[in-house]
Amino acid sequence: MAKFIQHIGLVAPLDAANVDTDAIIPKQFLQKVTRTGFGQHLFNDWRFLDDAGKVPNPDFVLNLPRYQGATILLARENFGCGSSREHAPWALTDFGFKVVIAPSFADIFYGNAFNNQLLPVTLSEADIDTLFQLVKENEGIEFVVDLEQQTVNAGGKSYAFEIDPFRRHCMINGLDSIGLTLQHEHNISAYEKQQPEFLR
């Protein structure tokens, strides 16, 4: 996995609370088990006016020209609620998002985000209100999200957030569960060599 230390990116404001995983990636697109290819269906029922996904909704935020290429999603409370599908962070990262900033996240989505190198940043509702206003009033504004310093820098101000030290360590070093295991490969090999032949 790629390391996440600092990210600078354009911000798209999704001004909606309780965005559930079925809205993020509708159930009809869940047939695959690989992580790629879901971005084209991200927010499908909101981004498109037809079932085939051919007619863009001109009023949806991700279809507006000013937010094309956004890599940071600004959202409202309880983002990622609903079913526990891991396809939700897959769709967000496949679309190009690296960070989601919101007042709160559903627990399962929050964990799945870290597992897929998508950084969920929690800020107060007051800070989120300020950031929404900032983005809407300043076309093309970019935020600097620094995981080492645990800050979001925007509009000349710094907003502090907290990430569990273990999850922070994993993201900064690009470690998933396999990577964590491989850090102990030498000890695992030494242990295996000590086992009786019939257990090897």
UniProtKB/Swiss-Prot annotation:
Native source species: Yersinia pestis
Gene3D superfamilies the record matches: Aconitase, domain 4
Name listed for the protein in its UniProt record: 3-isopropylmalate dehydratase small subunit
SUPFAM superfamilies in UniProt: LeuD/IlvD-like
One of the record's GO molecular function terms: 3-isopropylmalate dehydratase activity
Subunit organization: Heterodimer of LeuC and LeuD.
One Gene Ontology CC term in the entry: 3-isopropylmalate dehydratase complex
UniProt-listed Pfam families: Aconitase_C
Keywords: Amino-acid biosynthesis, Branched-chain amino acid biosynthesis, Leucine biosynthesis, Lyase
Single GO BP term: L-leucine biosynthetic process
Record pathway: Amino-acid biosynthesis; L-leucine biosynthesis; L-leucine from 3-methyl-2-oxobutanoate: step 2/4
EC class (word): lyase
Keyword Lyase: yes
Role played: Catalyzes the isomerization between 2-isopropylmalate and 3-isopropylmalate, via the formation of 2-isopropylmaleate.
Family: Belongs to the LeuD family. LeuD type 1 subfamily.
